[in-house]
Amino acid sequence: MVDVKLLLINTLTEEFNLPVIQQGSMSMDEDYPESFFTFWNNTTTDAAFYDDTETETIWDFDLNYYSDDPTSVNTILLEAKTLLKGVGFIVDGSGYDVMSDEKTHTGRGINLLFIERK
């Protein structure tokens, strides 16, 4: 069985060498890194059953990329999409704009699914 959160974090960290932060875990007085990813696990839904036991779980994540370099926001997120598809994540579309709490940063997000087979 795969640790899906660790797969997400490690894949992004190894490729981009940027912080990968669980959404909401930064303190209010903590400075934003120049560029970073955040993620949030929306749901984990059992999807397939055999003999009254779940055999598949669908992990649903939001992945956001923030940067003080607006030109990188689209390109890095699309690179992350390709990378994550290569390790088994399902990614539909090219993303959406996300709000930033800092005027210096812009953000873009994508939705990820991962089917964990048990």
Predicted regions located by residue number:
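Short intrinsically disordered coil segments
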Residues: 52-58, 78-81
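Compositionally biased, intrinsically disordered low-complexity segments enriched in polar/Pro/Gly
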Residues: 1, 30, 50, 55, ...
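Oligomerization/assembly interface segments of phage tail-like spikes and tubes
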Residues: 55-68, 105-116
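Short C-terminal domain-edge/linker segments immediately following a structured domain
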Residues: 52-54, 67-73, 92-97
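A generic structural signal for solvent-exposed, polar alpha-helical segments
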Residues: 42-45, 56, 95
